């Protein structure tokens, strides 16, 4: 069969994933049935890396061991020190993407190796490249980077052209004019 290609919205505060199946978009829940995964990474007292809800709980106890809002620093080389472990924003994003990949594989019952990832329209080419790198670190081939708020809705099937998301605010044609670095858009 065709490998599953999921759409991932790697958000600043929350991330989510979806897949195009049977002519419709299906949101992918995690093991607990949550569709949104907090974009938070933490290192607990034993040095274990936590992501999502577990990391958010850690943030309430010890915010110094947690990183959030790191998406905007992708591609800048800024480091985060979490309890003595150093991370680049790409590495933190990769941990969130890996968490999403695992949830998707559990939900779909098949391997997920590719994704379409949405980023803010203002992301420059460094940030877009950093997003692809984060996906690579998570074991995901990121075939396309698109401008949010589209990924979950525009989960691409094989060779399917990305069109306008019904109910979305903007069409991709409009965004193309505003954003010079649209070369990754199909």
What do the predicted segments below correspond to?
Residues 1-38, 43-185:
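N-terminal phosphate-binding loop and flanking beta/alpha elements of the actin-like ATPase fold
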């Amino acid at each position: 069969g065709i490998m599953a290609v999921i759409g991932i919205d790697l958000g600043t505060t929350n991330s989510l994933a979806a897949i195009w199946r049977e002519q419709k978009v299906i949101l992918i829940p995690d093991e607990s049935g949550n569709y949104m995964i907090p974009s938070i990474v933490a290192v607990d007292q034993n040095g274990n890396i936590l992501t999502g809800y577990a990391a958010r709980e850690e943030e309430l106890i010890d915010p110094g061991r947690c990183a959030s809002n790191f998406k905007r620093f992708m591609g800048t080389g800024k480091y985060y020190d979490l309890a003595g472990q150093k991370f680049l924003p790409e590495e933190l994003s990769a941990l969130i993407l890996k968490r999403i990949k695992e949830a998707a594989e559990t939900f779909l019952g098949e391997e997920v190796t590719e994704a379409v990832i949405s980023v803010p329209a203002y992301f420059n080419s460094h940030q877009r490249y950093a997003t692809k790198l984060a996906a690579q670190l998570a074991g995901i081939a990121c075939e396309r980077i698109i401008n949010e708020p589209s990924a979950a809705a525009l989960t691409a099937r094989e060779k399917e052209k990305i069109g306008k998301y019904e109910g979305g605010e903007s069409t991709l044609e409009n965004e193309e004019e505003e954003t010079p670095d649209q070369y990754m858009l199909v």
